[in-house]
């Protein structure tokens, strides 16, 4: 017996006549579809959180990141979080493109994204080491983060490393 499978998430939502023996839910399992009209009917279920591991005060002229990719134009507070391109937050999010949320406020990535960490400008955010950082979650969509770096949520979500601890919460 031949099993026919032709559709991914977008196909399932748009081409009901081609839903043969199987379909591939794919990215819709995360609550995304890469189609704004379809996304209205989906609920994102993924949250990616970490903590601030270090905060450093730097002075105007100091540098941050590989190859001194950020040279501070003013005094700044820089937070380091233990997430980097080895975990799926790739280098495209570096140098002010990507952002995460600290205390509900946007904190932009400064410098290059490193293997196991990245740095954030938290100059305007009252925070401390150990505070929670939301990379993706409620009010911090994968779509928005991906768009900030000119990519799509599918690339971000499927690129998350299996080394990230996962917890499934029912309900």
Please give the residue ranges for each predicted region.
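Active-site anion/phosphate-binding pocket segments in diverse small-molecule metabolic enzymes
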Residues: 4-171
